[in-house]
């Protein structure tokens, strides 16, 4: 993937960048793997906003992704590399030998025509999925399960990767993309390689309208609201927030405040906290 730059024909185009989509091989998704995706604009079933700054944007369809990769010892051939509007990573359409079609996350280096296999006896090759106990120390992995059979939950964004550091009994030590070192059950599965589309983070949106296409609505500063809408609100003209430190609309400190549950049971599985 390369970054495409635009000439400054307008103020919105100046500094705007996008992907050149060179890795994408088709623009038509597999119909059998599509589901309708309703735009709830951040509202719950009561019609109340539960997630701010969402709404509008282009209509989408959900691509059903196989995060479990549990079809053992059945080879699959990569047919296409496709764009997915619902995630930063690209996806790959694979056809299994038994006729089943599935979408998977496209790792870096995956190409059309490559053969993939899942299972404990699979080769250590980009795109293959294995239990962590069968993956050698030092291997780069992604799409990592946290509970056996639940499907991958960690390391799914574009350009991310984790590394196997060691094995201790029924657990495997994993260094995550954040720098956190964590123990995960050895029977959980992961996929070999790092997630593709690694230059996604370099894309410059360029203008407000492009954010609106992506269902992102504007963020209003609390200091320009009324006092009944935000703790920073109120006052005559441009007044300070009237506090030692900024807070969220619900009064939670906004800078340096730890939000993790101090009694989280998973604390015993975290060997080293994240570094960034």
From Swiss-Prot:
Keyword list, A-Z: Ribonucleoprotein, Ribosomal protein, RNA-binding, rRNA-binding
InterPro entries in the cross-refs: NA-bd_OB-fold (IPR012340), Rib_uL2_dom2 (IPR014722), Ribosomal_uL2 (IPR002171), Ribosomal_uL2_bac/org-type (IPR005880), Ribosomal_uL2_C (IPR022669), Ribosomal_uL2_CS (IPR022671), Ribosomal_uL2_dom3 (IPR014726), Ribosomal_uL2_RNA-bd_dom (IPR022666)
Record organism: Enterococcus faecalis (strain ATCC 700802 / V583)
Keyword rRNA-binding annotated: yes
SMART domains in the record: Ribosomal_L2, Ribosomal_L2_C
A GO MF term: rRNA binding
PANTHER family listed in its UniProt record: LARGE RIBOSOMAL SUBUNIT PROTEIN UL2M, RIBOSOMAL PROTEIN L2
One Gene Ontology CC term in the entry: large ribosomal subunit
One GO term (biological process): cytoplasmic translation
Family: Belongs to the universal ribosomal protein uL2 family.
Stretches for region Disordered: 34-55, 221-276
Name of the protein: Large ribosomal subunit protein uL2
Ranges of biased composition (kind: Polar residues): 37-48
Subunit structure: Part of the 50S ribosomal subunit. Forms a bridge to the 30S subunit in the 70S ribosome.
Purpose of the protein: One of the primary rRNA binding proteins. Required for association of the 30S and 50S subunits to form the 70S ribosome, for tRNA binding and peptide bond formation. It has been suggested to have peptidyltransferase activity; this is somewhat controversial. Makes several contacts with the 16S rRNA in the 70S ribosome.
């Amino acid at each position: 993937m390369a970054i495409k730059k635009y000439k400054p024909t307008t103020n919105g185009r100046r500094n705007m960048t996008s992907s050149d989509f060179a890795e994408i091989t088709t623009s038509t998704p597999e119909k059998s793997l599509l589901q309708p995706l309703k735009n709830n604009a951040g509202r719950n079933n009561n019609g109340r906003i539960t997630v701010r700054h969402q709404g509008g944007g282009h209509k989408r369809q959900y691509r059903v992704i196989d995060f479990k990769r549990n079809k053992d010892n059945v080879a699959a051939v990569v047919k296409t590399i496709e764009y997915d509007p619902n995630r930063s990573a690209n996806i790959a359409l694979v056809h299994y030998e038994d006729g089943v079609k599935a979408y998977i996350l496209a790792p870096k280096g995956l190409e059309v025509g490559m053969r993939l296999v899942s299972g404990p006896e699979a080769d250590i090759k980009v795109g293959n999925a294995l239990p962590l106990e069968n993956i050698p120390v030092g291997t780069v992995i992604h799409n990592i399960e946290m509970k056996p059979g639940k499907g991958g939950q960690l390391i799914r964004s574009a350009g991310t990767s984790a590394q196997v550091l060691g094995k201790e009994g029924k657990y495997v030590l994993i260094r995550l993309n954040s720098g956190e070192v964590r123990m995960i059950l050895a029977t959980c599965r992961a996929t070999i390689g790092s997630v593709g589309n690694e230059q996604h983070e370099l894309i410059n949106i360029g203008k407000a309208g492009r954010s609106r296409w992506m269902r992102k609505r504007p963020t209003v500063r609390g200091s320009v609201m009324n006092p009944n809408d935000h703790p920073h609100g109120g006052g005559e003209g441009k007044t300070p927030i009237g506090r030692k430190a900024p807070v969220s609309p619900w009064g939670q400190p906004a800078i340096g405040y730890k939000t993790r549950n101090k009694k989280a049971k998973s604390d015993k599985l975290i060997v080293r906290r994240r570094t960034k």
